Each structure stands twice: as C-alpha cells, then as structure tokens.
Swiss-Prot record:
SUPFAM superfamilies: EF-G C-terminal domain-like, P-loop containing nucleoside triphosphate hydrolases, Ribosomal protein S5 domain 2-like, Translation proteins. Keywords: Cytoplasm, Elongation factor, GTP-binding, Nucleotide-binding, Protein biosynthesis. InterPro entries: EFG_II, EFG_III, EFG_III/V, EFG_IV, EFG_V, EFG_V-like, EFTu-like_2, G_TR_CS. This is Elongation factor G. It holds the Pfam family EFG_III. It is found in: Cytoplasm. Catalyzes the GTP-dependent ribosomal translocation step during translation elongation. During this step, the ribosome changes from the pre-translocational (PRE) to the post-translocational (POST) state as the newly formed A-site-bound peptidyl-tRNA and P-site-bound deacylated tRNA move to the P and E sites, respectively. Catalyzes the coordinated movement of the two tRNA molecules, the mRNA and conformational changes in the ribosome. The keyword NAD does not apply.
Length: 692
C-alpha cells in the first residue's frame, strides 16, 4: 500500500491505564468517531471491537494488545489498546517499546491506582511522551481536581490541565477548552458525535481564568520570545500556545490533562485533537539506535522510507484464519509482500507471505508498508517477540525487550493420550506468543510445569488450551516461584578425576562465590593466568555453574544474584576436556554455595485494598496475619485505601477472604514488587515439603 500520509502526520500511540479505568471504552469511542466502527461496542455487553478474544469478552478485560488504524483531521493514528490487569503487564511493556506516544486513562473516582503507577513507570523507562484523559466524570464521587492532584503527587510529574469539566456526575455536559477559552458542550441525542462551542458559564469563569493563567505561564516557558511578550502584557495566540504545549509535552516538562466520560460520549473528540496536537510523530523521534551484529558498533536508523529496512517484532499472535501473525513496527525503509527479510536475532532469512493492516479482529491485505507503520506479517517461521527484521545488505540489531521472571507456577496434566500429543504443541505456540509465560518439565515427576505472572494469567492460558487447541487438562494448585541466593562469600577447590582404562577425565577448579545486590542477576568472571585452565575449557566451567544454578541446590529453585570468580585450576594435556571441566565446575560451585549458606527468596507483592472504613480493622488484621507489612493508609472519598507488601505465598485465595470480611464491598489489586529472603521457619517448611 503506497504511503497515504506523510510521516509527520503519523501518530503511533498506546492507550493504557489501571483495569476498569475505561481504556477499551475510550478506544471504542475513538473508532466510532473516526468512522472505523459503525456501532459502538460496549465492554459490559461483550461487544467491544478491541476485546476480540472470547475470554476478553466474557471477563470484560483486555488481555492482548489489539492493534488498529484510524484517521482524524487528515492524520493517521495507529492505536494499541493495552491490558490494565497486572498479570498482563508484559503486553504494556512490549507495546510501549514500539510506540511514540501514549494516552493514560484515569478513573475520575479512583484517581491514580496501582497499575496506573506501574504503566507510568514503564512509560518513563521507554521515554514515551504522554497525555492524560481523566475519564468517568459522570460517576458518583468523581472529582477531576483531586485526580489532577493525585497525578502530580503519585506520579511525580507536572500535570497541565488543558480542559476543566462543565458539571460533574449526572450533570456532566461538556468541558471548558482552556486553549480556546470556550465551553464545548455535547448534544446527547447524537451519541456524542455533535457538539457546539459556547461562552463559558458564569459560575466557571473565575476557575477557568485561574487554570488558563497557569496553562499560559507553564507553556510560554518553552519559548523565550513568547515569555517576554506575555510578561509585557501581550495576548498569546492560540497557535503559539499549541506549539508551546507540544514542545513541553515532547521534552517531558509537563503532561497535558484532558477530561470527560467516554461511556457518556463526552470528551473523546478533544482527546483526539490533543493526540494530534501534542503527541509526537515519528519525525519528532527522528531515529533509533541499534548495533552492528557481532559488534558493539552503534548504528543509527533514521525514520525514512529511503533508508534500509528495519523493524522490531513486538508481538506474535495465533489467528484462527491466518495462523501465526507477527506484529512489527517499521522504523525505516519499506517492506513488500513476497520479498525476503533478514532476522538478525536468529541469523535467518524470512519470507513475507502476507502482510495485513489490522483493525482489532478484522484485517486488510496490503502489498507494501513503510516507515512508521504497524502491520502484521503472516508466515514467518523463526521470528518471535523482540527480534529484529532488516535488509541483509544493511544488518542492524535493535535493542531487544526485557521480560520479567514468572512468579507463580502450576502443574498441568493432559486428561487423555490424545490430549498429551496436542498439549505440547499448544503450550509451545502460547509460549511463543507470550514471553512472560514459560513451560518446563519436572525431571523427577515428568510433570509439565507452566509459569506466569499471576493466577489469572495461567487461568487464561489453560482456558485458551481448551478453546483454541481442544486440549483438556487437569490443573494442580498454584505454587510460588521461589528463588535461591547466597548468604556469604565462600571459596572452594575441587578436583574431578576419573580413570577407567584409556583416556581418563581430569579437571581442577578453584572458585570464589559472592552474594550480590538484589536484582543484579548472575555473573561469572575468569581470573585464570598462565594457562592453568586453557581458554577453550572455560566455557565448560561456566556451563557447569549455569546447570547447577538453573536447577537450584537448596530446594530445586533457580539461583540468582551472585558472582563467581574462577581463581585457579589445573589441566592435563591428555585427560582434560570441556566435559571434565563442566563436571568439575558443577561440583565445585555446588559445594562452595553450600558452604556459603543458601537462602530461599520469595516474591513479595504490592497489594492495594480499597475498603469501606467499617471493615478497615478486619482488613489490616487479615493482611498482618498473612505476613503483610502495611505501607500506607489514606482516605479516597468515602473509602479507605490500604497499601501493603505481602508474600505471594500468603495471597492465594485472598479474594474470597476479602469478599467474606467486607460483605463483597472491598476490592483489591496486586502486582509483583521484589524478591525477599523468607523467614527460617518458612524456609524449613518449603524445603521439607519439597523433600517429600
């Protein structure tokens, strides 16, 4: 498909927020008003266009990032609707990696919620400029101004309201546009498609002027000449104000705040205008850096159709009609169907069979895609999430994505022999789609173990096995994904010697193992001098260490956060080999760690409970009984919000306890925060249970 819009008229955006803040509804309204959707789909009746998986329509939450393209005011907007449930944070992470800008949706009643903070931090990590939409102002208890304060206090940014609401709750009728200084009022009978500009109501003139003054003063800081003109009493033109707001948004000086109610069809068109006016085009980003394969040399890929092709695969999905689809963001050059592209990450050539422009679950075949496009490729054999595609003549390796370690695991067993044959294929395909989902086999029991980010995550995997692959499975109880770590530094020397006629095996290794800071991972360093261990045998030692690390020593859980230094060793000209040094490395590392004392680590979750005040005492008492540590307590409207750090092992089945103690009136959310050493009595229990 030949280019229809110049690159400066592209907007690649994500819509993200906490669960139930109204992201999918907001996206539905955007598709409706931009002409892509002839009927508005509602999340609560299971008809939302973007929520196209069966599980999503049943549960009313967005699980996978659906991509769609729409058009507004002669601009092309590629939207990715991302999930707000903490178990699917990986979807947000990989979407942000390929987006230029983001819209953060907030619930006007709840304000900034835990997952709002999580996605905000993710957007900070990838330096994604953003605007906010304070949604659901039609609901009882909504408070725009309190929400703006929460954005400032909790997210550590400078909010810049460019609108304020006219009316609130049932009386919400429109917004005051602080850039135009006009009231924008919607006509209810036209499903929000029609509105008119009016004079600002008398009762809002004073507060509108206050926020307008703050807006202008913050905006003109982006332009010295305009700042001078403003200080001299000159009126700032609307187009100059828009330019200043855009500049400040792109350089992270502030975050524009819009508002309304997507469900009540108010405020969506001005949000679209803000996307066009204030979020970046690929031209504003300019380029992306990669490296030359096999070296550290930096390669700059300019966002330009005329340069070599480069793209990042950010999602793999199974489509019931097309098969495996690989979603890519094109950073430079052009790609056409029928041509070959080079997968730098795998050093393989891929052929592009079909290329599709996606609209949630419908698709349009295209022959060509260009810089800035987000498209899906069918028929790729080797490419998975995070891989780079490019021209073989101009190879580049773009920075891959980082994926979190799973915190929960369950055993799954096929119900019949027929299911057994299909289960391996099903789990393999699901793991290819979702890098935060892992599949392993327990060597002793032969069981298949699936690992993920939470109970809901694994729930949906099992559900998809059944629906999409017709695999029936028995599912075990959820287990915590513990880790092992080192308490103290330790040094040990080990000699591996085996003689059984003919060539024997000989390897001597001396290792120093040291604990490292949490989150630092694993590292192995060689300080061998004088050829005590020849270079070709060092990988054997490293492999031995890795094998023991992966399988664990204390209780069979992977080891993390340590450093190993290979200090010395000895080899034999005939009897030494890579295998001999691998076996020596394994035994030496295991003994050194045992002498250094091993400790079990457990995932600790950040839990936020929103409860009526009447039940606060019971909720806090219950969290304390779960080894929880209360971090904060605050009032939010007529509810109390309790934040606590609680070990995941003590959170299974929490929803039922919370419903029971609050008569169904309290709710909670949780996400992984960090790994922490377990108390000795818990460690003894876990190791005893595993020992059987």
């Amino acid at each position: 498909m030949a280019r229809t819009h110049t690159l400066n008229k592209y907007r690649n955006i994500g819509i993200m927020a906490h669960i139930d803040a109204g992201k999918t509804t907001t996206t539905e309204r955007i598709l409706y008003y931009t002409g892509k959707s002839h009927k508005i789909g509602e999340v609560h009746d299971g008809a939302a266009t973007m929520d196209w998986m069966e599980q999503e329509q049943e549960r009313g939450i967005t699980i996978t990032s659906a991509a769609t393209t729409c058009f507004w005011n002669d601009h092309r907007i590629n939207i990715i609707d991302t999930p707000g449930h903490v178990d699917f944070t990986i979807e947000v992470e990989r979407s942000l990696k390929v987006l230029d800008g983001a819209v953060c949706v907030f619930d006007g009643v709840a304000g900034v919620e835990p997952q709002s903070e999580t996605v905000w931090r993710q957007a900070d990590k990838y330096k994604v400029p953003r605007i906010c939409f304070v949604n659901k102002l039609d609901r009882t208890g909504a408070d725009f101004y309190r929400c703006v304060e929460m954005i400032k206090d909790r997210l550590g940014c400078k909010p810049l309201p460019i609108q304020i609401p006219i009316g609130i709750e049932a009386d919400l009728s429109g917004v005051v546009d602080l850039v135009k200084m006009k009231a924008q009022v919607w006509k209810n009978e036209a499903l929000g498609a029609e509105w008119e500009y009016k004079e600002i109501p008398d009762d809002l003139k004073e507060i509108s002027q206050k926020y307008r003054t703050e807006l202008v003063e913050m905006a003109v800081e982006q332009d010295e000449k305009l700042m001078e003109a403003y200080l001299n009493g000159e009126e700032i033109k609307e187009e100059d104000l828009v330019k200043c707001i855009r500049k400040g948004t792109l350089n992270f000086s502030f975050v524009p705040i819009t508002t309304g109610s997507a469900f009540k069809n108010k405020g969506v068109q001005p949000l679209l205008d803000a996307v066009i006016n204030y979020l970046p085009s690929p031209i504003d980003i300019g380029s992306i850096n990669g490296t030359k394969p096999g070296s550290e040399d930096v390669v700059e890929m300019k966002f330009d159709d005329g340069t070599g092709f480069s793209a990042l695969a950010f999602k793999v999905a199974n489509d019931p009609f097309v098969g495996s689809l690989t979603f890519i963001r094109i950073y430079s050059g052009t790609i056409r169907t029928g041509t070959a592209v080079y997968n730098t990450s795998k050093d393989k050539e891929e052929r592009v069979g079909r290329m599709l422009l996606m609209h949630a679950n419908s698709r349009e075949d295209i022959k060509e895609a260009n810089t800035g496009d987000i498209v899906a490729l069918a028929g790729l054999k080797y490419t998975i999430t995070g891989h780079t595609l490019c021209d073989e003549a101009n190879p580049v390796l773009l920075e891959p994505m980082e994926f979190p370690e799973p915190v929960i695991e369950i055993a799954v067993e096929p119900k019949t022999k027929a299911d057994q044959e299909k289960m391996g294929e099903a789990l393999g395909r699901l793991a290819k789609e979702d890098p935060s989902f892992r599949v392993t086999s327990d060597e002793e029991s032969g069981q298949t173990i699936i690992k993920g980010m939470g109970e809901l995550h694994l729930d949906i995997i099992v559900d998809r096995m059944k629906r999409e692959f017709n695999v029936e499975a028995n599912v075990g109880a959820p287990q915590v994904a513990y880790r092992e770590t080192l308490q103290n530094a330790s040094e040990f020397e080990y000699t591996h010697k085996k003689q059984s006629g003919g060539a024997g095996q000989f390897a001597k290794v001396k290792l120093l193992v040291e604990p490292q800071e949490p989150g630092s991972g694993r590292s192995v360093e060689s300080k061998i001098k004088g050829g005590a261990i020849p270079k070709e045998f060092i990988p054997g030692v490293e492999k031995g260490i890795e094998t023991i690390s992966d399988g664990g020593i204390l209780a069979g859980f992977p080891m993390i956060d340590y450093k190993v230094t290979i200090l010395d060793g000895l080899h034999h000209d005939v009897d030494s080999s890579v295998l001999a040094f691998e076996l020596a490395g394994r035994a030496c590392f295991k003994e050194a760690c045992t002498r250094g004392t091993l400790k079990l680590l457990e995932p600790v979750m950040r839990v936020e409970v929103v409860t009526p005040e009447d039940y606060m005492g019971d909720v806090i008492g219950d969290l304390n009984s779960r080894r929880g540590q209360i971090s904060t307590q605050e009032n939010r409207g007529n509810a109390t919000v309790i934040t606590a750090m609680v070990p995941l092992a003590n959170m299974f089945g929490y929803i039922n306890s919370l419903r029971s103690m609050s008569q169904g009136r309290a709710q909670y959310s949780m996400f992984f925060d960090h790994y922490s050493k377990v108390p000795q009595n818990v460690q003894d229990e876990v190791t005893k249970k595993i020992a059987g």
